[in-house]
Amino acid sequence: MRIKMVSAYDRAEEVSKLFKEYTDMLIENDSSFQKYLDIQNYSEEIEHLESKYGLPDGRLYLVYCDEELAGCIGLRKIDSQNCEMKRLYVRPEFRGRKIGNLLVEKIIDDAKEIGYSHMLLDTLPFLKSAIHMYKKYGFYAISSYNDSPMDTSIYMKLDL
């Protein structure tokens, strides 16, 4: 198994494909998630990836497993001290191979290198394996930090 991680800024079509799979999965498990996407101006995000995830304050990666598109992750600036992990997604056929771990480790390392003090994220209760992984890396539960309309959202923070 050969894994390769690449910067995704010039691969908008592949990013869009993975983001769509990710959001479709979330909506399938909780139809109210569509309202959250609308609040986040999700359609704008896809069209302007660099404005949300651009260098020097953000990151956007794709990962390939044996040359097949396997997953993605993003990092966006909230303010000078805080960043947010976004759009962690590993395609179902590639899960269980520690690809999610590689993506999370990379984005944490990048956040430290940029100089952020804290990384935030929000997730949903049915993403149990992701929540377990976040806790393994030191994330802990916090109160809401964004305008999510999702009553079930779980908010987490990592002190970098």
Label every model-predicted segment:
Residues 1-17, 21, 160:
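Conserved N-terminal entry element of GNAT/NAT acetyltransferase domains
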Residues 6, 20-49:
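Conserved GNAT-fold acetyl-CoA-binding loop/helix
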Residues 45-62:
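A short helix-loop-beta-strand connector motif used in the catalytic cores of GNAT acetyltransferases and
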Residues 62, 68-76, 84:
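Conserved beta-strand in the GNAT
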Residues 77, 91-97, 125-126:
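Active-site acidic-Proline motif in GNAT/NAT acetyltransferases
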Residues 90, 96-109, 136:
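Conserved acetyl-CoA-binding loop-helix of GNAT-fold acetyltransferases
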Residues 117-160:
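C-terminal "cap" of GNAT-fold acetyltransferases
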